[in-house]
């Protein structure tokens, strides 16, 4: 569960290392974002000579949350960290690689490129 002012890790090679959530997209009074939701974030840490710079305002999709997510079969899944992937306005990832596992819920949200790049889908 991600809300405004949450610090997230970045799970791709776009160059950003930490993101700071500015806004959760989808509704005027929406407070929380879960797996597969899009947020607007500021880059708090970035590596030199990368596609995104420190201070850039980017869109990102949540791929892992520490808060458990219930599934239709009654099971739950949770991860060790809160992570996101930086995306462009066409909902495609800015980076070319995804690090770590991602949740199966991304497939239902039509983020096929992220699912195909991920080393493991849980």
Curated annotation (Swiss-Prot):
The gene is rplN. This is Large ribosomal subunit protein uL14. Part of the 50S ribosomal subunit. Forms a cluster with proteins L3 and L19. In the 70S ribosome, L14 and L19 interact and together make contacts with the 16S rRNA in bridges B5 and B8. PROSITE patterns: RIBOSOMAL_L14 (PS00049). GO terms for molecular function: large ribosomal subunit rRNA binding; structural constituent of ribosome. One of its GO terms (biological process) is translation. PANTHER family: 50S/60S RIBOSOMAL PROTEIN L14/L23, LARGE RIBOSOMAL SUBUNIT PROTEIN UL14M. Binds to 23S rRNA. Forms part of two intersubunit bridges in the 70S ribosome. Keywords: Ribonucleoprotein, Ribosomal protein, RNA-binding, rRNA-binding. GO terms for cellular component: cytosolic large ribosomal subunit. Belongs to the universal ribosomal protein uL14 family. The keyword Hydrolase does not apply. It holds the Pfam family Ribosomal_L14. It comes from the Bacteria.
């Amino acid at each position: 569960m991600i809300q405004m002012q949450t610090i997230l890790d970045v799970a791709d090679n776009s160059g950003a290392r930490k993101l700071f959530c500015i806004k959760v997209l989808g509704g005027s009074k929406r407070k929380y974002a879960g797996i597969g939701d899009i947020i607007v974030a500021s880059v708090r840490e970035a590596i030199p000579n990368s596609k995104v710079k420190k201070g850039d305002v980017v869109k990102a999709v949540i791929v892992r949350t520490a808060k458990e997510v219930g599934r239709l079969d009654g099971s739950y899944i949770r991860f060790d960290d809160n992570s996101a992937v930086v995306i462009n306005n066409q909902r495609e990832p800015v980076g070319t690689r995804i690090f770590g596992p991602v949740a199966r819920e991304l497939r239902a949200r039509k983020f096929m490129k992220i699912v195909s790049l991920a080393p493991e889908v849980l």
